[in-house]
Amino acid sequence: MANAERMITRVHSQRERLNETLVSERNEVLALLSRVEAKGKGILQQNQIIAEFEALPEQTRKKLEGGPFFDLLKSTQEAIVLPPWVALAVRPRPGVWEYLRVNLHALVVEELQPAEFLHFKEELVDGVKNGNFTLELDFEPFNASIPRPTLHKYIGNGVDFLNRHLSAKLFHDKESLLPLLKFLRLHSHQGKNLMLSEKIQNLNTLQHTLRKAEEYLAELKSETLYEEFEAKFEEIGLERGWGDNAERVLDMIRLLLDLLEAPDPCTLETFLGRVPMVFNVVILSPHGYFAQDNVLGYPDTGGQVVYILDQVRALEIEMLQRIKQQGLNIKPRILILTRLLPDAVGTTCGERLERVYDSEYCDILRVPFRTEKGIVRKWISRFEVWPYLETYTEDAAVELSKELNGKPDLIIGNYSDGNLVASLLAHKLGVTQCTIAHALEKTKYPDSDIYWKKLDDKYHFSCQFTADIFAMNHTDFIITSTFQEIAGSKETVGQYESHTAFTLPGLYRVVHGIDVFDPKFNIVSPGADMSIYFPYTEEKRRLTKFHSEIEELLYSDVENKEHLCVLKDKKKPILFTMARLDRVKNLSGLVEWYGKNTRLRELANLVVVGGDRRKESKDNEEKAEMKKMYDLIEEYKLNGQFRWISSQMDRVRNGELYRYICDTKGAFVQPALYEAFGLTVVEAMTCGLPTFATCKGGPAEIIVHGKSGFHIDPYHGDQAADTLADFFTKCKEDPSHWDEISKGGLQRIEEKYTWQIYSQRLLTLTGVYGFWKHVSNLDRLEARRYLEMFYALKYRPLAQAVPLAQDD
């Protein structure tokens, strides 16, 4: 109720501000809103609203600038125009939304609740339908018992808030400590108790036993191995799992005694992070071609594959270290669960089980898509996998049980399809679930919710957005690579934030889908594989054996399906980019910027690695981008200054390719219209290559502008090209400028973007959220039932309506 009252007060003050401005600057406000209304029925985005403001006469603008209406205008993310009404979605700060509606004829300002705003917005598509019942999806009532921070600093730092809440609320008296005892007594591995035996039945016995153990251990040398006092511990009711030597066991016992006596957030996190509870991990990534060789650059196969392969190696190292320090002799298992593709010639995608390189306990487990007619053999776009996933989940559960001889301890989903399957598996098996979106498609395709019917035949967004909402509400915790993924920035809406309130007209409206202040959100940034990506200055590690191949790729005069166009001046620095060839990655946009900018063309050559011209693409978007590339080469006469190389699948050689570009004193550019994180940005910076990257999304956080790289706006290509040209001009005048940016990038990576930091954080989060899942289990039952109904009554019919692929 308090939240609702706060929101009404907040909206009311915005309405009053607008009313006051209508009194004091009536003509000026009307001049702007009339321009907006004149655009006719439709949606205006923030940049279009600001453009209308800037088109006003200077005198009119000056009267409004700096006033409350101008602040409201800058915070308005979209305007819905249905003359004579203009509705505004106002976002004063990340995660906080207010809705207003102005009647330009009557000069009436109304405040709207989210459902009212969405209903108004739906009239753009369906017209006025006052009598029709529409399902409203609202998860807010289920969150009443779950703590919610209100401070901006806790967005993406949910575990800190949760630790404070748990230590304050769960441990305020003796009775409230019982969940911790029950949680510790749950832990076992293959029938063998860990930490506590059946002798410990209550809190008094636990505290008494811990004090006895503390006294005993204090007399031992710190390096005394657990085996030497194991029998003594078993006598008093303590089992393995506390540590591998006296020092670690004593430290762990004192942590628990402190928690039982006077809990604090840091002690709680440290203790839960060390509790032995993660031995088997399953990672979901069904779509695309998931393998270790010869797949990068295939449709739907890019950064996510690289991310997961690097992730599992780092997780294995951290798990092995923790298991050893816990005094256990358990072999962990990490399974990457993906789709088996029988016809993926030249790859291992048809093999059921494949060991991950440079690992002992990580495997790729492949399970095929199946229908009543049998196994589906052909590749299927990530937009068309929906009708297969429920059967896939059931088949996967059987295969996992065979491989693990039991249940996993943690299930991690990736992207929309992987997160849906992870949710279904976690629901079925009752285990902790982690969600990683990588990219939420709703933010990539503007207005893809309100106009979903136009796009559904091609993209099936009705399925995907439904799966996303289901998974993000089902999961125990969500990790993102950046703050922007969750809550955007002052100017831009976050990927998750865009799911707070939206509508799919005729299907359902989401009045409260996700709250960016939810403590399940945590920022855990990945790194680059340091064995592949390392600074160009480390001469002894450089893979010079690849240089002749790299020179052939970049500079040979031969034009074929591997490389198109030639570089005439081989002494110029290389402006380099590497990505999938799709609309959002915007490689064709970069080529156009370059083609238009004479100064940049004189200063540097452009090399683009993307798309596979060696074979005919099955992906419609890639085909369209390829045509665009061919047209641009002709339009701007790029041959001589530009090289287009087909996708390169050898990551090791790609690492040396980045370093070779460093040798030319070149730069890397990532021009995406939106990028959730930007793994190639991290890879390039890790090699010491000065990097320019989109300001739309994660790279804006990775790069500190002007120090460790540069931000570019993909929607202002001319400015981006000038920024690139300015850099190369400055480097020509002062070569130390290149070194300065290169070193700044390397320093930034060391501080924040390594897989070691990532894996430590992920396992600690699993401990904390595993405990939270245990203590809040009853409170979450209603939400689970609501999600089950939403899945069965909405998602399943949508998935069944997606056409099945026809094998040739």
UniProtKB/Swiss-Prot annotation:
UniProt keyword list: Glycosyltransferase, Stress response, Transferase
EC number in record: 2.4.1.13
pH-activity profile: Optimum pH is 6.0-7.0 for degradative reaction. Optimum pH is 7.0 for synthetic reaction. Optimum pH is 9.0-9.5 for synthetic reaction.
UniProt entry tagged with the keyword Transferase: yes
Pfam families: Glycos_transf_1, GT-B_Sucrose_synth, SUS_EPBD, SUS_N
Cited InterPro entries: Glyco_trans_1 (IPR001296), Sucrose_synth_GT-B1 (IPR000368), Sucrose_synthase_pln/cyn (IPR012820), SUS_EPBD (IPR056736), SUS_N (IPR056735)
Molecular function via GO: sucrose synthase activity
Coiled-coil spans in chain: none
GO BP terms in the entry: cellular response to hypoxia; response to cold; response to flooding; response to glucose; response to hypoxia; response to mannitol; response to osmotic stress; response to sorbitol
GO cellular component: cytosol; plasmodesma
Spans annotated as GT-B glycosyltransferase: 277-754
Keyword Glycosyltransferase: yes
Disruption phenotype: No visible phenotype.
Swiss-Prot/TrEMBL catalytic activity: an NDP-alpha-D-glucose + D-fructose = a ribonucleoside 5'-diphosphate + sucrose + H(+)
Tissues with expression: Expressed in the phloem of leaves and in roots. Detected in the whole plant but more precisely confined to the vasculature in cotyledons, mature leaves and siliques.
UniProt biotechnology annotation: A one-pot system for efficient enzymatic production of a wide range of glucosides couples the activities of two recombinant enzymes, UDP-glucose: curcumin glucosyltransferase from Catharanthus roseus (CaUGT2) and sucrose synthase from Arabidopsis thaliana (AtSUS1). UDP, a product inhibitor of UDP-glucosyltransferase, was removed from the system and used for regeneration of UDP-glucose by the second enzyme, AtSUS1. The productivity was increased several-fold and UDP-glucose initially added to the reaction mixture could be reduced to one-tenth of the normal level.
Top-level enzyme category: transferase
Induction, as annotated: By cold, drought and anaerobic stress. By sugar or osmoticum. By anoxia in the roots (at protein level). Up-regulated by NUC/IDD8.
NCBIfam families for the chain: sucr_synth (TIGR02470)
Its job: Sucrose-cleaving enzyme that provides UDP-glucose and fructose for various metabolic pathways.
Assembly and binders: Homotetramer.
Family designation: Belongs to the glycosyltransferase 1 family. Plant sucrose synthase subfamily.
Protein name stated in the entry: Sucrose synthase 1
Species classification: Eukaryota, Viridiplantae, Streptophyta, Embryophyta, Tracheophyta
